[in-house]
C-alpha cells in the first residue's frame, strides 16, 4: 500500500462501502474466548449498540456477522473493519493531519496495535490479557479520522475507546481527553467488566494501553531492572556480602510471564547480571520474546532445564532461560530439587484471573482456554487450587531463604482469596510488595519514576541523540545532587549510557528512563532546544507510565507504602490528570484498573508533544513540575521521610510552591491520650 492510499484510508474513517470479511489469522496471538455473561436481552442490546456505528443499509449484512462474533468470541470486534495497511508507528509526516499533535497521537495509537508490540493485536489488546486501546475496529477507524481532520481549536473526547466527538476548545487545551472504565464504584467487579465490555459500553485500558503510551516491554524494563538489582542488593546485604554487581553473579531469579509487561523480566535479569528463569504458558508469547531477543534460551522440558540452571548459576552467567510451561510445575520442581533460589516474583496477569490472566496447573494452554469459556465456574476452582499449590511451593523456597516480592499483579491478593498460605499472623501479607520494599521508599518518595519519550521521526539516530542529551543532563545534575539520591542517579546514568547496547526498542523509537522532576524537566527542555536547532529531525512525545510517583492510587502496588490510612483513596491520581490537563498536556487519560485490576486501582497519565516552540518550553516547565510533585506532596503528608526531604528540596528550587508538611506526634503521647478515660 502506498502512503497516499494509507492517507486515503485514514481519512475515509468507516468506509461507505464495507470491506470484504477478513479471515481469522491463526498465526497471530488471539485473545481467549470471553465468558458468555449476557442475557438474551443484553445480547440484543450489544448487537444494537454495535450497529449504531453504521448506516441502516449496512445493518442486514453486519448484524449476523456481529452476532456470530459475540457468540464465538464473547465480544464484537468487527474484524471485517481491520485495516489492510501494516500497523506500526510511522514517521509523523506520513499521517494526514491538520496539526502535528494529532499526527503524533495517531503514531502512538498505531504503535500500541503493532503486532510486534501488542499481545492480541486483532482484538485491539496491547498487554495484560485485556488492556484495550479500543473495543472494536469501527472505533479505531473513526478515531483516526477525527485525529486526521481536527485542528488546534478542538478536543477529541474518548469514552472507553468510543470517540464521542470533536468539541471546540483552544490551542492550550488537550487535543484528546481519554477515560477508560470509569464506572460507578459499586459496579466495578470482574463480572461487571465482562458485562459492560460485552455490551460495548466500557473497557479496561490497563495503564498505557488505553492511553496510547505503550512502548513495548522496554516500558517496564528499567523499573524491573531497578527492582531486581535492589532486591539482589538486599539479599547480599542480609548475608553480610558486599552488594556489588560482581557478587550478584550466579544469583537465581525465578518468575512467570513473557507478555507485554512481564516480558521485560528476562532482559532485566541479564542487565542485572543474574540468572533468570521465567515461565510462560503461551507458546506464541514465549516464541515472540525469544525471536525478539528478550530471552536467551527457550526450554519446554524441566529435566533439561534443571541441569541448565545449575550450570548457569555455577558459572555465574548473566543469562535468561524461558520455561514454556506452567509456572506451578516449575516452582514445585525447584522446591523438590536442591537448588538455591535467591529471588522470586510473579507477573502472571492475575488482575484478570478468570479470563486468560492465569492458567491452572494440570491443564494445557488450549484446555484452559476452552474451559474458561465453556465451564467458567470449574475454571475458577481450578485457578484457586493452582494458586494454593503455587503459593505452597514458593513458601517452601522462602523458608530456605528466598526473597519473594509481589510485583503488583494481584498475585498475593488473589492467592489470599483462594485460601493460599500467604498471610502472616497479623493478617497482613507474608511477602512484601516491591513498592513497599524497593520502588516506593527508594524511588517514588524521592520523585523518581518512569519518564519516557518517543522520537516522532522514527529515526534511530534521533533516539541515539536523545540518549546522549539525557546522559549529559543527568551527569550535570548528579554533580550537585544530595547524597541521599546519588545512588539512584548513578543507576540511571548507567542505564541510559547502556540503553542502546541492550537493544531495547520494539516498535517505535522510544526510551524509558527513571528520573525525578529536575531531571525530567531539564532533559525535556534540552530535547525541545535540539528540535528548535534542527538537531532532532521531528517532534518528540514525552510521557510516562501511570505506574509513577503521582499517577496511580493502588493500595496493593503504587501506594502500598502509604501508611497513614489513605492508601485506598484516589484523590492523587484524579487530581493529577486534572492538573496536567490545564498545564500543557497534549492528551490526558484516567482509568479504572491497571496492574492489580478492575476496581482495585485508579490511575492516569499524559502525553505531551514538544516541537521546539516557546509554548512547548512553557508546557514542559509548568506541567512536569505538577505531574511529579503532586505525588511527592501526598507521600510527604503520609510522613514518608524521603518524600518530606524531596518536597523541601523542590520548595527551595521553586519559590511559588508551598506544600503543607506534616508535624510528627510522639507515639507515647498518642498512647497515653488513648488510655486516658474521662
Question: Predicted regions: what is each one?
Answer:
Residues 540, 544-575:
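Small-residue-enriched alpha-helical segments and adjacent helix-cap loops
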Residues 320-348, 355:
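Active-site/ligand-binding-proximal alpha/beta "capping" segment
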Amino acid at each position: 500500500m502506498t502512503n497516499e492510499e494509507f492517507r486515503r484510508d485514514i481519512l475515509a474513517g468507516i468506509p461507505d462501502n464495507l470491506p470484504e470479511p477478513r479471515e481469522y489469522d491463526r498465526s497471530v496471538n488471539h485473545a481467549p474466548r470471553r465468558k458468555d455473561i449476557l442475557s438474551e436481552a443484553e445480547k440484543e442490546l450489544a448487537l444494537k449498540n454495535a450497529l449504531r456505528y453504521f448506516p441502516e443499509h449496512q445493518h442486514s449484512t453486519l448484524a449476523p456477522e456481529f452476532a456470530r462474533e459475540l457468540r464465538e468470541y464473547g465480544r464484537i470486534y468487527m474484524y471485517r473493519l481491520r485495516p489492510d495497511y501494516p500497523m506500526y508507528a510511522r514517521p509523523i509526516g506520513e499521517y494526514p493531519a491538520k496539526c502535528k499533535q494529532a499526527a503524533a497521537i495517531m503514531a502512538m495509537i498505531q504503535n500500541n496495535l503493532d503486532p510486534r508490540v501488542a499481545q492480541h493485536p486483532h482484538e485491539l489488546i496491547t498487554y495484560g490479557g485485556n488492556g484495550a486501546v479500543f473495543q472494536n475496529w469501527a472505533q479505531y477507524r473513526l478515531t483516526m479520522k477525527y485525529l486526521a481532520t481536527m485542528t488546534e481549536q478542538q478536543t477529541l473526547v474518548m469514552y472507553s475507546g468510543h470517540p464521542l466527538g470533536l468539541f471546540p476548545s483552544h490551542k492550550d487545551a488537550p487535543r484528546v481527553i481519554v477515560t477508560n472504565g470509569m464506572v460507578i464504584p459499586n459496579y466495578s467487579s470482574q463480572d461487571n467488566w465482562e458485562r459492560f465490555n460485552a455490551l460495548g459500553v466500557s473497557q479496561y485500558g490497563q495503564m498505557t494501553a488505553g492511553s496510547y503510551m505503550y512502548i513495548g516491554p522496554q516500558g517496564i524494563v528499567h523499573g524491573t531492572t531497578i527492582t531486581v538489582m535492589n532486591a539482589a542488593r538486599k539479599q547480599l546485604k542480609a548475608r553480610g556480602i558486599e552488594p556489588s554487581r560482581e557478587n550478584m553473579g550466579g544469583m537465581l531469579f525465578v518468575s512467570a510471564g513473557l507478555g507485554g509487561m512481564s516480558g521485560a523480566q528476562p532482559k532485566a535479569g541479564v542487565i542485572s547480571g543474574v540468572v533468570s528463569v521465567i515461565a510462560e504458558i503461551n507458546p506464541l508469547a514465549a516464541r515472540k520474546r525469544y525471536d525478539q531477543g528478550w530471552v536467551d534460551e527457550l526450554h519446554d522440558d524441566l529435566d533439561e532445564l534443571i541441569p541448565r540452571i545449575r550450570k548457569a548459576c555455577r558459572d555465574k552467567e548473566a543469562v535468561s532461560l524461558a520455561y514454556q510451561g506452567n509456572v506451578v510445575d516449575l516452582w514445585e520442581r525447584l522446591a523438590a530439587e536442591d537448588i538455591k533460589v535467591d529471588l522470586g516474583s510473579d507477573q502472571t496477569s492475575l488482575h484478570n484471573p478468570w479470563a486468560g490472566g492465569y492458567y491452572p496447573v494440570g491443564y494445557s494452554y488450549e484446555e484452559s482456554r476452552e474451559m474458561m469459556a465453556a465451564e467458567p465456574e470449574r475454571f475458577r476452582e481450578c485457578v484457586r487450587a493452582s494458586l494454593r499449590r503455587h503459593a505452597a511451593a514458593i513458601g517452601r523456597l522462602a523458608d530456605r531463604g528466598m526473597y519473594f516480592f509481589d510485583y503488583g499483579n494481584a498475585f498475593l491478593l488473589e492467592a489470599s482469596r483462594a485460601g493460599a498460605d500467604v498471610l502472616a499472623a497479623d493478617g497482613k501479607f507474608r511477602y512484601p510488595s516491591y513498592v513497599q520494599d524497593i520502588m516506593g521508599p527508594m524511588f517514588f518518595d524521592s520523585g523518581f519514576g518512569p519518564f519516557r519519550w518517543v522520537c516522532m521521526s522514527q529515526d534511530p539516530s534521533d533516539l541515539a541523540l536523545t540518549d546522549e542529551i539525557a546522559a549529559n543532563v543527568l551527569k550535570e545534575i548528579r554533580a550537585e545532587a544530595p547524597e541521599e539520591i546519588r545512588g539512584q542517579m548513578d543507576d540511571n546514568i548507567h542505564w541510559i549510557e547502556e540503553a542502546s547496547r541492550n537493544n531495547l526498542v520494539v516498535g517505535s523509537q522510544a526510551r524509558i528512563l527513571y528520573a525525578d522532576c529536575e531531571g525530567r524537566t531539564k532533559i525535556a527542555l534540552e530535547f525541545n532546544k535540539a528540535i528548535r536547532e534542527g538537531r532532532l529531525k521531528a517532534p518528540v512525545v514525552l510521557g510516562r507510565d501511570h505506574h509513577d510517583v503521582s499517577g496511580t492510587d493502588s493500595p496493593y502496588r503504587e501506594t502500598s507504602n502509604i501508611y497513614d490510612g489513605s492508601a485506598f483513596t484516589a484523590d492523587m491520581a484524579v487530581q493529577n490528570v486534572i492538573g496536567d490537563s490545564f498545564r500543557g498536556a497534549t492528551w490526558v487519560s484516567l482509568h479504572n484498573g491497571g496492574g492489580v485490576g478492575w476496581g482495585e486501582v485508579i490511575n492516569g497519565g499524559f502525553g505531551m508533544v514538544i516541537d521546539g516552540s516557546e509554548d512547548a518550553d512553557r508546557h514542559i516547565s509548568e506541567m512536569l513540575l505538577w505531574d511529579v510533585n503532586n505525588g511527592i506532596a501526598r507521600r510527604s503528608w503520609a510522613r514518608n521521610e524521603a518524600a518530606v526531604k524531596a518536597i523541601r528540596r523542590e520548595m527551595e528550587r521553586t519559590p511559588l510552591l508551598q506544600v503543607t508538611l506534616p508535624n510528627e506526634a510522639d507515639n507515647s503521647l498518642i498512647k497515653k491520650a488513648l488510655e486516658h478515660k474521662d
